[in-house]
A protein has these predicted regions:
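Flexible "arm" and connector segments at domain edges
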Residues: 1-40, 44-94
């Protein structure tokens, strides 16, 4: 199977996962937490695989995310705990 076809399959799978997440979220509080977590983790997995297929290492993706988070922290409200917590999590991994 060609590399382009594999990338296209991963892209289609990612869109499918995001659609599934939106569907699960519309079900309200009756949704199993595992279903939400599975969608989120599967999307992250596909994005890491796609990045590798496109020639980027997992470390390069992590470093880019940290850079973007640092920039977001400097541009956003200094009290934005979501960005700060994610940045701290990524720093601890590497």
């Amino acid at each position: 199977m060609s590399s382009v076809k594999i990338v296209e399959q991963y892209k289609a799978r990612l869109i499918s996962i995001i659609g599934e997440l939106f569907t699960v979220l519309t079900k309200g509080s009756n949704v199993a937490q595992d279903a939400i977590l599975d969608c989120i983790s599967n999307a992250i997995i596909i994005l890491y695989i796609l990045s590798e297929r496109l020639g980027y290492s997992h470390t390069a993706v992590d470093e880019s995310m940290k850079k973007n988070l640092r920039e977001g922290l400097s541009e956003e409200d200094k009290h934005d705990n979501d960005l700060r917590r994610l940045y701290s999590h990524l720093k601890e991994r590497h």
